[in-house]
């Protein structure tokens, strides 16, 4: 495809910590967090003027889904904007509790596992051509997804070692560090379920666009990333592989014998050299599989050209990330890739305090890395110190908080803003815009995710502004 729509859905962890008194339950904290959302949108599931969706997911997890983005720059900016929007709700709740004299601190975490072992996700969405043979795409994509965590994993401390396969309890071995948070909680390669079986790819066919032309690839195996550059590499590298598959490029069959088991193997092997069993009886390492894809993608780009100006950046960081693992030199990427940024921070703290990874303080710092608070979060502390790289500017993120990208999201965002300004009841989803007037209803279907204008929607927006609804 010459153009693609991207989106990221992020579930956040929420907790109220009150060492000197009773803490709010998860349900109470979530209910109070979303009180301003309910007041604004009359529901806890709303679309915002920037085109994104904000809602409470299963288990009292705040979730933000970015607006449809058509560029790597925009999807990274929208993801960062979502974190800022949800953290603003956290800040408002903290102020409210402080004013009421309720002791304690509200924490919002952009991570994937809580202290009880419950997992929550970060889902990536890629629009693909309906004509793409889906089974072929899955065959090439799964080995890539299993092994890309050596680049884009968020990193995780295991104070008592890795958990046993299929177990929620901590391990009973030596303390260790893994590439991925999510890997220990994925059970199969692909499925139409997301919560029961936790697959790597959700195969339920919900395109949120013209189903004759498009399909939505829903990837749910990735970690939530604090680093913008890690997010950009995650989306950018996956997009390049998809382009190559869609173009009919012939790739070797690297079907894994057991993708879920391989996912764990890769996560807990920081050398990238564990042998992964393939379905044909042979084996490959994560480094070998990633190098194979990178080399094929590089040749593809050389033949067909780069489809956006950040492709060289993606390829360079991809290669450097693999070199960092191969050479066991995380300093090559400890400003750009989450697992390496976090590891550098933890290693320095442990060395200066005479600790190892089994110490509870290291697990606390692991969690604090993902705290979204600009003042308390460790990643944001590194950001303020200039210790990590960015992919978009703070101004880009601020703009994305209130403004939709140049896609269908721009139409939706303008419609939502106009309906709220006119105080007119309305219903919105990814495709439909509906005015629920006192005497009549008007509905528009926006099936083209790239369209920034549509006559019937423009008419509704004009009528809302004129008070003619």
Curated annotation (Swiss-Prot):
Enzyme class (EC, first level): ligase
Single GO MF annotation: ATP binding
EC id: 6.3.1.19
Residues that coordinate or bind ATP: 53, 66, 430
Involved pathway(s): Protein degradation; proteasomal Pup-dependent pathway; Protein modification; protein pupylation
Catalytic reaction annotation: ATP + [prokaryotic ubiquitin-like protein]-L-glutamate + [protein]-L-lysine = ADP + phosphate + N(6)-([prokaryotic ubiquitin-like protein]-gamma-L-glutamyl)-[protein]-L-lysine
Matching Pfam families: Pup_ligase (PF03136)
Any single biological process term in GO: protein pupylation
Residues binding Mg(2+): 9, 55, 63
Positions of the catalytic residues: 57
Superkingdom in the source lineage: Bacteria
InterPro entries: Pup_ligase, Pup_ligase/deamidase
Alphabetically ordered keywords of this record: ATP-binding, Ligase, Magnesium, Metal-binding, Nucleotide-binding, Ubl conjugation pathway
Family: Belongs to the Pup ligase/Pup deamidase family. Pup-conjugating enzyme subfamily.
More info: The reaction mechanism probably proceeds via the activation of Pup by phosphorylation of its C-terminal glutamate, which is then subject to nucleophilic attack by the substrate lysine, resulting in an isopeptide bond and the release of phosphate as a good leaving group.
Function summary: Catalyzes the covalent attachment of the prokaryotic ubiquitin-like protein modifier Pup to the proteasomal substrate proteins, thereby targeting them for proteasomal degradation. This tagging system is termed pupylation. The ligation reaction involves the side-chain carboxylate of the C-terminal glutamate of Pup and the side-chain amino group of a substrate lysine.
Record-given protein name: Pup--protein ligase
UniProt gene name: pafA
């Amino acid at each position: 495809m010459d153009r693609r729509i991207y989106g990221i859905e992020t579930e956040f962890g929420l907790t109220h910590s009150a060492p000197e008194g009773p803490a709010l339950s998860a349900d109470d904290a979530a209910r109070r967090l979303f009180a301003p959302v309910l007041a604004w949108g009359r529901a806890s599931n709303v679309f915002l003027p920037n085109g994104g969706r904000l809602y409470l997911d299963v288990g009292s997890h705040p979730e933000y889904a970015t607006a449809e983005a058509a560029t790597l720059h925009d999807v990274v900016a929208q993801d960062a904007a979502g974190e800022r929007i949800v953290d603003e709700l956290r800040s408002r709740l903290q102020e409210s509790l402080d004013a009421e004299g309720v002791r304690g601190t509200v924490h919002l975490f952009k991570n994937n596992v809580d202290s009880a072992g419950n997992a929550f996700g970060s889902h990536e969405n890629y629009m693909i051509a309906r004509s793409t043979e889906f089974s072929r795409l899955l065959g090439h994509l799964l080995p890539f997804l299993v092994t890309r965590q050596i680049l884009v994993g968020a990193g995780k401390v295991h104070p008592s070692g890795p958990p046993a396969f299929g177990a929620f309890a901590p391990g009973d071995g030596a303390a260790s560090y893994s590439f991925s948070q999510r890997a220990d909680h994925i059970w199969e390669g692909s499925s139409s379920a997301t919560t029961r079986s936790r697959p790597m790819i959700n195969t339920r066919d919900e395109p949120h666009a013209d189903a004759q032309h498009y399909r939505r690839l829903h990837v749910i195996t990735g970690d939530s990333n604090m680093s913008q550059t890690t997010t950009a590499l995650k989306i950018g590298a996956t997009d390049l592989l998809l382009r190559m598959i869609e173009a009919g490029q012939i790739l070797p069959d690297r079907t894994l014998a057991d993708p879920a088991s391989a996912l764990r193997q890769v996560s807990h092997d920081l050398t990238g050299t564990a042998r992964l069993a393939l379905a044909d009886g042979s084996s490959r390492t994560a480094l070998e599989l990633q190098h194979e894809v990178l080399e094929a993608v590089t040749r593809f780009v050389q033949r067909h050209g780069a489809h956006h100006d950040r492709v060289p950046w993606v390829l360079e960081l991809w290669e450097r990330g693999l070199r960092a693992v191969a050479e066991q030199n995380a300093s090559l990427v400890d400003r750009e890739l989450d697992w390496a940024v976090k590891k550098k921070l933890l290693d320095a703290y442990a060395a200066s305090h005479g600790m190892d990874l089994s110490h509870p303080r290291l697990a606390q710092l692991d969690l604090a890395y993902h705290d979204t608070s600009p003042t308390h979060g460790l990643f944001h502390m590194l950001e303020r110190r200039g210790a990590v790289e960015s992919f978009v500017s703070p101004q880009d993120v601020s703009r994305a908080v209130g403004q939709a990208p140049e896609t269908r999201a721009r139409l939706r965002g303008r419609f939502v803003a106009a309906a709220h300004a006119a105080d007119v009841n309305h219903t919105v989803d990814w495709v439909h815009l509906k005015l629920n007037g006192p005497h009549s209803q008007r509905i528009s279907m926006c099936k083209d995710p790239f369209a920034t204008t549509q006559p019937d929607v423009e008419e509704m927006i004009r009528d809302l502004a004129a008070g003619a609804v």
